[in-house]
Amino acid sequence: MKAALISGSSSGIGKAIAEKFLGNGIKVVGLARDHSKFMPNEKHYIPIEADLSKVKKLPELMKSILKENPDIDVFVSGAGYGEFKSLENFSSLQIENFIDLNLVSHIILCRAIVAHMKSQGNGDIFILGSEAGVIGKKKATLYSAAKFGLRGFAQALRNEAGPAGVRVCLINPGMVRTPFFDTLEFEPDALETNAIETEDIAKIVFDFLGTRQGTIIDEINLSPASKSLRFKKTSK
């Protein structure tokens, strides 16, 4: 049985991937701040409460997780949030907190998991990036900074870990219909062609696991067929 660690497992893309894995017999260790939103009645689901923005606590957290779950051979790095406004409207603390969760936490978690996978001689790491990591847009300065950072990190880690049998795949979706937009002033328009569904991404990740070890998929870019937005209120 494969075993996966998923950060951001309680909602959105992470939740969909967890459900897909569990439905296909893959054990899931889920990292999230609030598991009340997703608590499947599955003996193979292990919820671990963690605030991944507290980056100094992550090394000890990962040490504990891997000690208790040495069978982990899949990691989905998906935790994060969005905040979109002009750069000058962010405080220094907001910038630090944003980059800590959306970039630094991914790097620290991957540092622990890649060492574990190298010792096993195999493993799959999926990093959830964004189309904002491919092209920068206004009011997405911090989000693009984090996602461009993840893209470069994934490329370098792939070259570093590949010879040890560890595959690294970066997934860059466009707008996905998830609770990500709950706190934002905009969201994809209701027409189904304006957003990717989480199940689409979960299927791609699961199907990748079925490919032979010698097949590497460096990066996957996904876009909705159209990109109309609905604004909930007037943007400032």
Predicted regions and their residues:
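Residue(s) in the substrate-gating loop at a strand-loop-helix junction
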Residues: S130
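C-terminal helical subdomain
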Residues: A164, L170, P188-R230
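Active-site helix of classical SDR
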Residues: C110, A146
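Conserved NAD(P)H cofactor-binding loop of Rossmann-fold oxidoreductase domains
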Residues: G78-E83
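Substrate-binding pocket helix/loop in short-chain dehydrogenase/reductase
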Residues: S86-L87, Q94-I99
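Active-site-adjacent segment of SDR/Rossmann-fold oxidoreductases
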Residues: I135, A156-V166
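Conserved glycine-rich cofactor-binding loop
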Residues: S10-S11
